[in-house]
């Protein structure tokens, strides 16, 4: 990528969504997962190839009821099949129940701090689900993010990811 340097690295990624509405189009809950382009090995093992620049992934839309756990599994499988490192985003803001996303080994990181949703609705910080998963013996990392939308309130430079890596390369990060 043309902006990469010894001090800065761009990791391509995408966000996919699934939304559950009631019968009158009222929002009930949703899943948001990020797929960050994985290591060379993950890319080589991508069953479905890699996502293309600006490729749009249509959201999954359901009405009335859904099997939220199955939806999460399908979304994660889609990202994994495209060579991605996977994060599950802002579960409190999304109004999901723990059984819908607390699935061992399905994603790499759980977002425990989302600066945008902290400012928007006070629902962006929560370590309870992560702690619950760890107590169940699940192995999942945690992350913090800005989720920058440049909307009606400040949502940048409040959450960030720090990585202890040997070097600033895609595979090491």
Model-derived regions: residue spans:
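Active-site-proximal structural scaffolding
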Residues: 103, 123-126, 135, 156, ...
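Aromatic- and carboxylate-lined catalytic core of secreted/periplasmic carbohydrate-active enzymes
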Residues: 167-173
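A metal-dependent hydrolase metal-coordination microenvironment
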Residues: 1-83, 89, 96-98, 103-105, ...
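A short helix->loop->beta-strand "cap" motif at the edges of active sites that frequently abuts
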Residues: 7-8, 136-140
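Short acidic/histidine-rich active-site segments
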Residues: 138-157
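Sec-exported extracytoplasmic/periplasmic mature domains
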Residues: 80-84, 135-138
